[in-house]
């Protein structure tokens, strides 16, 4: 007579090794979901370094399980579960990133004056570095416009460039 144990297919050692981290991941995700109670919350009791470490551990665990394709049905369920958990928990920024962002936003319009030249510091916004070039192009354009003017152009040009705020025109431009 054959025993029922001998009829059962045995799982290879690789599946057992993959099942224990899978169990740990499911326990971790169940613990996070139990604390959530239906609405995503932030881990408020953790320091920023601890939040970043927790995020990295969850990310590493999810990526390691998603790379193992032993069971396609389980990997699809794990993938959905990992994406759901990763979507609920916002990724904490490192402290250096926050400091750099604040420093950039505060100092982006500052310039360093060395002697007679205006040297733009490295934290200036890239678009603000183009302002001197725009001024040079505008001056070149006005020089070209002056060369090709008719006798009547100076009257209308004076009105548009030197119009007083109160609406009156000076005697030189009439």
Curated annotation (Swiss-Prot):
GO terms for cellular component: extracellular region; terminal bouton. Pfam families: NMU. The modification Methionine sulfoxide is found at residue 139. Keywords: Amidation, Cleavage on pair of basic residues, Neuropeptide, Oxidation, Secreted, Signal. It is found in: Secreted. It comes from the Eukaryota. Belongs to the NmU family. This is Neuromedin-U. It comes from Homo sapiens (Human).
């Amino acid at each position: 007579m054959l025993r029922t144990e001998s009829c059962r297919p045995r799982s290879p050692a690789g599946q057992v090794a993959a099942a224990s981290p899978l169990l740990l991941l499911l326990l971790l995700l169940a613990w996070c979901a139990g604390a959530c109670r239906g609405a995503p919350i932030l881990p408020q009791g953790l320091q920023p370094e601890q939040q970043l470490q927790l995020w990295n551990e969850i990310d590493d665990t999810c990526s390691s399980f998603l790379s193992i394709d032993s069971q396609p049905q389980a990997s699809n369920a794990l993938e959905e579960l990992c994406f759901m958990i990763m979507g609920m928990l916002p990724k904490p920024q490192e402290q250096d990133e926050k400091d750099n962002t604040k420093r950039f936003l505060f100092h982006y319009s500052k310039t360093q004056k060395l002697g007679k030249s205006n040297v733009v510091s490295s934290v200036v916004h890239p678009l603000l570095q183009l302002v001197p070039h725009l001024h040079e192009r505008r001056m070149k354009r006005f020089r070209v416009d002056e060369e090709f003017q008719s006798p009547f152009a100076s009257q209308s040009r004076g009105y548009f460039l030197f119009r007083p705020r109160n609406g009156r025109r000076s005697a030189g431009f009439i």
